[in-house]
Regions:
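Substrate-binding clefts and catalytic carboxylate motifs of secreted carbohydrate-active enzymes
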Residues: 1-111, 116, 121-125, 158, ...
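Compositionally biased, intrinsically disordered or flexible polar/acidic segments
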Residues: 97-292
Length: 292
């Protein structure tokens, strides 16, 4: 924005233009998801064309703001401003991964879903061309968590919405730095078919002390010791994990991902139950892919 403000030359540039893959949940009854798009410009107004639909916005403080209905797949955007008699453009292509609101509205279009638990943030894994979207609570016909609350890392002055730990065994720390604690279940009303499911865990509570981070000085984490939580995992009535103790089996601050396959018949969907043996069950992230 500072470059736009100080420049004497005409400027028009999409904000966050390095964010090539996006994702979100479809609006109820629709085949699109509204997300914000910003355009930096030192003109008075900006015209934005998205998939051949024209939008206009005034520039305020060198930013034009739009709310765009992204559809599944490739979305083409063109921003245009006029300076005196000259027209200037910027182009952006976004691969949008639309997640179902109601599975019945997706028919056979559903392929995959990657969900971060205990957070509202989105994470783009550029290496694997994958987008992770935030959790939502389950409602009938859709998907989401049942019960629990987001993990909060305790500090001297309150808490943080995620862990700052470097997670061993993964290059994608954001997948494991948040979790839902005390989760009762995760349910998806998917159509009949074969699916691959991956559950991601990390034990974030440990007695390992780390070097203080420069950006976090004064808000130091309080270490409460390793958790000895033990729980069972039940997939559509079948135990797939019994007496799972993550810290004992895998260690703390380590990425754990376990994959399962399931066939869904008779419209039963998928339901994962977490059954406490000791302490509170957790889930950091969830993935599902349809096997074609």
């Amino acid at each position: 924005m500072y470059k736009t403000k100080l420049s004497k030359e005409p400027i028009i540039k999409f904000g966050q233009n390095e964010w090539k893959i996006r994702g979100g949940v479809a609006e109820a009854g629709k085949d699109y998801c509204f997300q914000p798009v910003t355009v930096y410009s030192n003109s008075d107004s900006v015209q934005l064309i998205h998939n051949n639909v024209v939008y206009n916005a005034e520039v305020k403080d060198y930013i034009a703001r739009f709310s765009i209905p992204f559809t599944n797949g490739l979305n083409k955007l063109k921003a245009t401003s006029t300076f005196q008699t000259e027209t200037y453009n910027d182009l952006l292509k976004i691969d949008f991964r639309l997640a179902p609101n109601q599975f019945s509205e997706f028919d056979d279009d559903f392929d995959e879903l990657n969900v971060l638990l205990g957070t509202k943030r989105i994470y783009e894994d550029r290496i694997n061309s994958m987008i992770w979207i935030p959790e939502q609570e389950y409602v009938q016909g859709s998907w989401g968590y049942i019960g629990g609350k987001p993990y909060r890392a305790k500090t001297k002055f309150g808490s943080l919405p995620s862990s700052e730990l470097n997670i061993k065994g993964s290059q994608d720390d954001p997948i494991y730095q948040t979790q839902r604690v005390g989760i009762n279940g995760f349910k998806l009303d998917v159509p009949n078919g074969k699916y691959s499911i991956t559950l991601h865990w990390t034990e974030l509570e440990s007695n390992i002390k780390h070097e203080k981070l420069a950006y976090n000085l004064g808000n130091d984490r309080i270490f409460e010791g390793s958790s000895s939580r033990i729980f069972n995992v039940i997939l559509n009535g079948e135990y797939i994990e019994k007496n799972l103790n993550i810290s004992e089996k895998y260690g703390v601050e380590k990425a754990v991902s376990v994959k399962y396959q399931i066939s869904v018949n008779d419209g039963e969907g998928i339901k994962i139950n977490f059954e406490s043996v000791k302490g509170l069950p957790i889930l950091n992230a969830f993935q599902i892919r349809k096997i074609h």
